[in-house]
Amino acid sequence: MSFPSSAASPARSEQAVPEGAAKEPMVTFEGVTKTFGGADGKPGFAALAGIDYTVPKGSITCIIGRSGAGKSTLIRLANGLEKPSTGRVVVDGVDVAALDEKSLRTLRRSVGMIFQHFNLLSSRTAFDNVALPLEIAGLGKKEIEARVAPLLDLVGLSDKAKRYPAELSGGQKQRVGIARALATQPKLLLSDEATSALDPETTQSILELLKRINAELGLTVLLITHEMEVVKTIASQVAVIDRGLIVEEGTTFDIFTAPKHETTRSLLSSSVGVKLPHWVTSGLKQEATDGDRVLVRLVFFGETAFQPLTARLVAEIGPDVNILAGTIEEISGQPFGSLVVSYPASAEVTARANRFYAETGLHTEVLGYVA
């Protein structure tokens, strides 16, 4: 992986991770547990209860979960801020817990980290904040200048190099934090709720920056967040953690469009697809009676997102089709649409509709019945 060496050359799309490289592991958690406390014969708190998970090289991987699920503990294991109680954490082929202090310091230079709170030194300019880890590493003034200037250019802050944190906006402070995290030319970037203190517009600009860094530098990004919009925008894959265990994992698109675990469905319930109004859900039944209408969620993605399937459904089963709600959005760069319709729950209409779904390959979910 190459980092920019001059202010004039941050664009390196040709050096993006080649196809297939993402299958190699950057971080591997092998049977990892972590227990806090437990002194004097008292039981400890199991923050992690047996994690087996791999973060591929070159990926942007998101860990999501409820508060207290173990997200922050998991990410702190990746740079040796915490050690596992049992199991192994392997970063780029190195068992982190097996390292002595000197080797651990070397490893940490290959792992950058950005935080919700920017942790900038108020007495240092943007340039000097980015330079700090290089000064600690013992680099000379000319080498620091050659490293910091292109990084500030990369994050769009060349004109703010001499500004102090108090003179910067929240988004600009986070960009300084990102540049500082990249100063030691890491292979892995850890992000702990890095956008949660930012407004939506600034969040989007930071996400675009992280995507560009990932693409141009081939940098692996592992982030935790409670913001599902962040995950949809940036992640290539997702892992869901609950009570110290990975309960579901997969590509971002698969997790968001077809969540399987109850925890995943709960986390995503308000961020994907259609949320029905209360006046509809309050009258929803799971069994049909004579004269009822069935509510069906139709899911469109890939090529089906651009086909006139709703019009064809009306042509197939008749004009008595009501559209109750609908949305279309982009998840991990792919179109995804969701439409809730109702039509008579009679055997004849249901048979025609089911035949149409089978012929078109349309994904459907029966939500219930209303009078």
Swiss-Prot record:
Reaction it catalyzes: L-methionine(out) + ATP + H2O = L-methionine(in) + ADP + phosphate + H(+); D-methionine(out) + ATP + H2O = D-methionine(in) + ADP + phosphate + H(+)
Membrane topology reported for the UniProt record: Peripheral membrane protein
Subcellular location: Cell inner membrane
Annotated EC: 7.4.2.11
Family, similarity comment: Belongs to the ABC transporter superfamily. Methionine importer (TC 3.A.1.24) family.
Protein name, as recorded: Methionine import ATP-binding protein MetN
Enzyme class: translocase
PROSITE patterns: ABC_TRANSPORTER_1, ABC_TRANSPORTER_2, METN
Compositional bias annotation for Low complexity: 1-11
GO cellular component: plasma membrane
Organism: Agrobacterium fabrum (strain C58 / ATCC 33970)
Function according to Swiss-Prot or TrEMBL: Part of the ABC transporter complex MetNIQ involved in methionine import. Responsible for energy coupling to the transport system.
Residues that bind ATP: 65-72
